[in-house]
């Protein structure tokens, strides 16, 4: 209520009513399809680690070979229902074309569903087209079959930047799910208290979710959240803290309050 007028709140409520309670994320092999929503729980790899390590070669910056090896592991382990985002960032590929190589590797090394990065209209269009071809679908068929997803981070406080909004519009129009995930760090871009930071997270998530339904009513979307705190001496993000876990518990309850789809 602090962030939205009652009229705006009514708009958001009407839009959120069209969010599907469940959907299927289709892999290229039917046995790897993932049911999202309801009482289903799905596990994926973590995303965007800058470095990786192993016993033989130690710690190093991410590269395409390591990226491919992580995809092989994701394909092998049945506890991973989908690959998620880039398990390690392949910094040896230029950023301007990295998405093309990474999606090609997704398609080559695994038949599970994957996450694409919403970094502007052109890159999202590339991802949609490559995924459509890999699944053997027409554009009309793809609009009714979720094949990939994307994490959409807000630019807290209370805004979404242009590349993310372009991704939301392109993916929602094509019926591909997005996870609206506010990145709200208490003491930095969000109030310093957990209650205040989670309130901001909730406002931003609901606004993003409502926007997907303005683009296309019934588009699959999930409530995400990354609320943590910062080191008050250095300003650096702090991960795995008690405050982070408190925010996750509260965020999950809020997501179930508003929607039956949740991603944390």
Question: Model-flagged regions — what are they?
Answer:
Residues 4, 63, 199:
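Short, conserved glycine- and acidic-residue-centered signature motifs
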Residues 151-262:
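Glycine-rich anion/phosphate-binding loop at the beta-strand->alpha-helix junction
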Residues 1-8, 12, 262-263:
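Single conserved hydrophobic/aromatic residue that forms the stacking wall/gate
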Residues 4-8, 50, 251:
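Residue-level detector of solvent-exposed, low-hydrophobicity positions
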Residues 9-191, 195:
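Catalytic alpha/beta active-site cores
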């Amino acid at each position: 209520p602090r962030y939205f007028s009652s009229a705006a709140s009514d708009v958001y409520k009407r839009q959120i009513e069209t969010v599907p309670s469940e959907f299927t994320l289709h892999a290229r092999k039917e046995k790897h399809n993932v049911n999202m929503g309801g009482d289903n729980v799905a596990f994926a790899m973590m995303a965007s680690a800058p470095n990786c390590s192993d016993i033989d070669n130690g710690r190093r910056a991410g590269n395409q070979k390591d990226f491919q090896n992580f995809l092989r592991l994701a394909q092998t382990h049945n506890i991973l229902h989908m690959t998620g985002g880039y398990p390690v960032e392949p910094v040896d590929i230029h950023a301007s074309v990295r998405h093309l190589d990474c999606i090609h590797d997704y398609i080559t090394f695994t038949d599970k569903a994957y996450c694409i990065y919403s970094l502007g209209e052109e890159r999202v269009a590339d991802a949609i087209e490559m995924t459509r071809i890999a699944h053997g679908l027409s554009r009309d068929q793809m609009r009714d079959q979720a094949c990939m997803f994307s994490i959409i981070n807000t630019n807290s406080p209370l805004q979404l930047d242009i590349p993310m909004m372009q991704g939301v519009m392109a993916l929602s129009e094509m019926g591909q799910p997005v996870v609206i995930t506010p990145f709200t760090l208490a003491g930095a871009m969000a109030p310093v208290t957990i209650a205040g930071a989670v309130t901001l997270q909730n406002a931003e998530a609901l606004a993003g979710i409502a926007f997907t339904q303005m683009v296309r009513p019934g588009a699959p979307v999930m409530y995400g959240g990354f609320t943590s705190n910062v080191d008050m001496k250095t300003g650096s993000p702090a991960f795995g803290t008690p405050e982070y876990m408190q925010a996750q518990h509260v965020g999950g309850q809020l997501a179930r309050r508003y929607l039956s789809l949740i991603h944390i």
